[in-house]
Amino acid sequence: MALSQNIILRLMNRFPMLQYFTDRPFGIEIEFYGLDYVLAPIDNNIIKPYCISSRAKDGRNFQQLYKDFKIPIGADRDCWHFEKDGSVRGKGHTQFGAELISPILRGITGLVQAYNAFRFLCNIQGLNIDDSCGFHVHHGVDSKVFTCKQLQELVRLVYPIEEYFYLLIPGNRKNAETCKPMEIDVMAFLDVCDSESEKGSDKITQLWYSLENHYDPKSARYPRYDKTRYHGLNLHSYWYRSTIEFRYHSAVLNNIDEAMEWIIFTQFLIELSQGHVPNICFYPEANKWLNTIYMIYEKLGHENCIKRLAN
């Protein structure tokens, strides 16, 4: 408990935007290669903890390692678990491509779990990342509240600064097949929600699941793997699991602060899209994502909501 409190204090001091972090549910997926494991066809791509032979860098066995970091690794999708990831190349092969997937997390205590998960991965011998690896963040939304208008507002926020995301994020993510820029008809997307009518919601769904956006009708049989999900802003996840997924970011292992900043920043975008515009403080030495928030506020005409701290 003391360790968690120390991490919370560190995060609060390190990330000023954490004061606006809400209890909205979120989840993360961290891709990498180099995990030694075996997988049976009946495992449904879930890597059972007892099927992992990797050890800690200091020689501890795998089970002891995740217990020490208080990351309860399990064998189903309702807990922290590992899955095989065929999109991860890992020095030209996919044999050991994998990802660590979180359960549903909430608030600062969830952020502490995510922080510890990265520390846990950093201590596994042989784990590494390359350009084929990504770091994905899901933020939960209630479809009764987060409707056509909020989806529209989110696209309105993200689309003008999408290029900026790709510039700020390490690696050449813009050209990656798994996190492409928006390919929907954005102007049409922003023009269909004049009311909360069912007609507007149907139209926005049609615009997402279009051939232009790489929709494949055959994939409807396997909705989890719908091809429209391979965009930096994945709205397929909205209809599939009631989350908004941000896939822009490259994989993160050692630079844990970068991962924390991205989680906080992307949640803030969701809150903005729901009309939550808090007063925020101006910090001259703000990190790149807080600076991006300042830029968004200025573009939206919310300059008066940026408060300068007294000297």
Could you tell me what each predicted segment is?
Residues G140-D142:
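Short glycine-rich beta-strand segments
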Residues G134:
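His-enriched metal-coordination microenvironments in redox/metal-binding proteins
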Residues A2-N128, K144, C148-N311:
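C-terminal accessory/tail domains of diverse enzymes
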